[in-house]
């Protein structure tokens, strides 16, 4: 990371000189129309060049943002659609490097999330923000929003941010970890179905090498006393059951999760289970974890590959 990279990041988040000098009634009018959810007035304003030139300008109290961010924050779908129709930048950043999609996800506005994704919003959010829409949805248990993000290409595994120092390497904090710790089993399962790595929620060996002592999902789930369903899912999706080191104190406890892990260590995987792992792993490596439905095999086998049997 050099000074030029840092300067570029801060320049992206600073308002233009024109924005600073012209906190005009035009910008206030646009924001007021969005705040009032008055899509008709907003549309009429944006048909005039004196207003449209400020469609991507950041303004407002608190966290200055664009009108599109404001619409996403309040869940004002009709205003959001009007702004997009008039050419608003779908991935515009506020001063915290958050995109309108990130804001919509944070506030739980599923309809706005769908429209933004269909308009081409990056499902991963901004590379300059250490959080992401997927992390937020997994933490909040917003399974429908998480489904939309993953269906539009969001990454289920942890990836290094740009620049490198923007990545949190002090601890494991991928979406699988958050879903487990916050008790969102549906999100946990959904992430695994979309190719999340069941060991570290990360396939980037370079990134893992920078973590002093990476902890596996199995370790985290046992440490936080997660329900046995989490342990079973990790085992079923191919987690390395020998990675967690279990002390004698733990193995002597009457814990269902530990019992499942010990049972898995003592019982070889069935051939059918191993085939499922190989097929799913091959699809993930090809970047098409959801292509199972396209396989020319009996429906019952498709259901098995999707962990529905």
From Swiss-Prot:
InterPro entries: Ankyrin-SOCS_box_domain, Ankyrin_rpt, Ankyrin_rpt-contain_sf, SOCS_box. Keywords: ANK repeat, Repeat, Ubl conjugation pathway. PROSITE patterns: ANK_REP_REGION, ANK_REPEAT. Coiled coil: none annotated. Pfam families: Ank_2 (PF12796), SOCS_box (PF07525). It comes from the Eukaryota. Residues 268-308 form the SOCS box domain. One of its GO terms (biological process) is protein ubiquitination. ANK repeats lie at residues 63-92, 96-125, 129-158, 171-200, 213-243. One of its GO terms (cellular component) is cytosol. Pathway: Protein modification; protein ubiquitination. PANTHER family: ANK_REP_REGION DOMAIN-CONTAINING PROTEIN, SOWAH (DROSOPHILA) HOMOLOG. The SOCS box domain mediates the interaction with the Elongin BC complex, an adapter module in different E3 ubiquitin-protein ligase complexes. Interacts with CUL5 and RNF7. Belongs to the ankyrin SOCS box (ASB) family. Probable substrate-recognition component of a SCF-like ECS (Elongin-Cullin-SOCS-box protein) E3 ubiquitin-protein ligase complex which mediates the ubiquitination and subsequent proteasomal degradation of target proteins. This is Ankyrin repeat and SOCS box protein 12. It comes from Homo sapiens.
């Amino acid at each position: 990371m050099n000074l030029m990279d840092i300067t570029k990041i801060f320049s992206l988040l600073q308002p233009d000189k024109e924005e600073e000098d012209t906190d005009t009634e035009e910008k206030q009018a646009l924001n007021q129309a969005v705040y009032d959810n008055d899509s008709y007035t907003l549309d009429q304003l944006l048909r005039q060049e004196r207003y449209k030139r400020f469609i991507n300008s950041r303004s407002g109290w608190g966290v200055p943002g664009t009108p599109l961010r404001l619409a996403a924050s309040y869940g004002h779908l009709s205003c959001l659609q009007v702004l997009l129709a008039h050419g608003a930048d779908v991935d515009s950043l506020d001063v915290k490097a958050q995109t309108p999609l990130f804001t919509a996800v944070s506030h739980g506005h599923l309809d706005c999330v769908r429209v933004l994704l269909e308009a081409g919003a990056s499902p991963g959010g901004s590379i300059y923000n250490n959080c992401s829409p997927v992390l937020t949805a997994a933490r909040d248990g917003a399974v429908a929003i998480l489904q939309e993000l993953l269906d539009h290409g969001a990454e289920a595994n942890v990836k290094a941010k740009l620049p490198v120092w923007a990545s949190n390497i002090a601890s494991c904090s991928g979406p699988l970890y958050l879903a487990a710790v916050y008790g969102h089993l549906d999100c946990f399962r959904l992430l695994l179905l979309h190719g999340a790595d069941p060991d570290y929620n990360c396939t980037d060996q370079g990134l893992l090498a920078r973590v002093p002592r990476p902890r596996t999902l199995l370790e985290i789930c046992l440490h936080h006393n997660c329900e046995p369903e989490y342990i079973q899912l990790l085992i079923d999706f191919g987690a390395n059951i020998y990675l967690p080191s279990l002390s004698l104190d733990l193995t002597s406890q009457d814990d269902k999760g530990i019992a499942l892990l010990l049972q898995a260590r003592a019982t070889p995987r069935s051939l059918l289970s191993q085939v499922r792992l190989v097929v799913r792993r091959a699809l993930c490596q090809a970047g098409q974890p959801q292509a199972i439905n396209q396989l020319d095999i009996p429906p019952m086998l498709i259901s098995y590959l999707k962990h529905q049997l």
